[in-house]
Amino acid sequence: GILVLMHDNTIDRTTNGSGAVGDYSYQQLQQLYLKDAAGNLTNERIPTLEDALKKGKGKVYFNLDIVNKNVAVATMVALLKKLDMENEVLLYVSNNRNYAYDLKAANSTLLLHPMAKASDDITYFASSYTDNVQMMQLSTSDALAGAMTEDIKSKGWLLFSNIVGANDTNMLSDNYSGLVGMINKRINVVQTDYAELAAKYLKSKKYR
């Protein structure tokens, strides 16, 4: 099959179609149009993952949320090898140890992006994936509470969390408290739907 770039398991929110992504053929998906963030229909089609990766190759790092998306390990690994992008794509595995194991077994050089839901997740990935993990994720609540922060930092990993939701949309009203909260908790990578606003604010405050 052909991998496409789609965050949700269904196409209801992001296109003018409905149902599960996996229930459609690639040809059928190409008949649909994407919606913008406000839900307005655009003239854009659903991109293949390969096309999206090619656009950013050598320019950005990709963070792909593929866990629980029914993405076959062999298909994902083959695509990254084909594009020579094993070192440019971080594969989000949450704390799914079986999926992480299967990915590493298929290609020992892949970059994995796990999430710590408990301290034993940190211990596990630190002991078994020292060459694969450079960044660990915490939930928004755990990050703001400072939970497990020092343990993750002690491994030499970057710390990732997100402000998607109210803290994110608040930036549209010039309220950056959610972002500042992450900075104060020493979060290195903050996921946001408003990267340009966040970058402008960080630059104005000389954080970058």
What are these regions (language model features)?
Residues 1, 8-9, 32, 67-69, ...:
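Active-site beta-loop-alpha junctions enriched in small/polar residues
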Residues 1-58:
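An active-site metal/cofactor-coordinating segment within enzyme catalytic domains
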Residues 18, 23-26, 82, 129-132, ...:
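Alpha-helix termination/capping residues and helix-transition junctions
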Residues 25, 45-49, 72, 76, ...:
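Stable alpha-helical elements in mature extracytoplasmic
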Residues 34, 54-57, 61, 81-85, ...:
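Sec-exported extracytoplasmic/periplasmic mature domains
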Residues 39-41, 115-117, 123-208:
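C-terminal active-site rim and adjoining tail of enzyme catalytic domains
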Residues 42-44, 62-69, 83-148, 190:
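Catalytic beta/alpha-barrel core
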Residues 49, 55-69, 195:
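Active-site groove signature of glycoside hydrolases
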